[in-house]
A protein has these predicted regions:
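Active-site gating/metal-coordination segments in enzymes
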Residues: 1-123, 127-128
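H/E-rich (His + Asp/Glu) clusters that bind or coordinate divalent metals
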Residues: 102-126, 132, 137, 141-201
Length: 201
């Protein structure tokens, strides 16, 4: 398919670029998440043959990150012992996540990205992904959106949610945040302090 062909070319180019300065660069694989068997196959090739160090995908996963259809993908990441980096997808309609309210004032970047990242964190933790795959390493872009700021509210509601994961119910959402990784590309000390309060970043 087009997606698979693109990822094959992207990953080869990524490996070629890393090879120019392997002591300074590492590369992450792009994966055709529209077709999970192909994504798993390309992940194995990218890591085992091309020497890439993990994978990077967007938040535009229609079934959500907690869907058990993704479990073979998570297991493949664990088997290969490589991390997954999740970056916010655009909310301007390019990836199908169109929200016209975000068209003004760069809201797609300031609010849309944060919304996508927060949803990803919440789905992963409340949906029990790390209960099912405790050795899985996932890093979320931009400090995980607003997850650290909203941790107590999410935890409060999780305690009365019969579908919330056992990990969150037993340990609390804030504690479970420590099972994820976050980059520190956040703006300002207030955001950085909230992130440091809960998570290793």
């Amino acid at each position: 398919t087009t997606a698979t062909d693109f990822c094959l070319r992207h990953n080869q180019l990524m490996a070629d670029t890393v090879a120019v300065a392997p002591d300074r660069l590492v590369g992450l694989a792009a994966l055709p998440m529209q077709e999970l068997p192909a994504a798993c196959e390309e992940l194995e090739r990218a890591v085992g043959t091309l020497g890439l160090k993990g994978a990077m995908i967007g938040t535009d996963i229609p079934q959500g990150f907690a869907c058990q259809s993704l479990d073979p993908f998570y297991q493949k990441l664990t088997d290969l012992d490589v991390p997954l980096f999740i970056h916010a997808s655009s909310t301007d309609g390019v990836s199908g996540l169109k929200d016209d309210r975000l068209n003004l004032h760069n809201f797609s970047l300031s609010l849309g990205y944060a919304q996508e990242e927060t949803l990803a964190v919440a789905q992963l933790l409340l949906g029990g992904v790390l209960d099912r795959h405790p050795a899985l390493d996932i890093c979320i872009s931009h400090g995980g959106g607003t997850a650290a700021f909203l941790a107590e509210k999410i935890d409060q509601l999780a305690q009365v949610d019969p579908t919330a994961s056992e990990g969150v119910k037993q340990n609390g959402f804030g504690h479970e945040l420590q099972k994820l990784w976050f980059d520190t590309h956040v703006k300002g000390e207030v955001a950085a302090t909230a992130l440091r309060h809960y998570a290793h970043a």
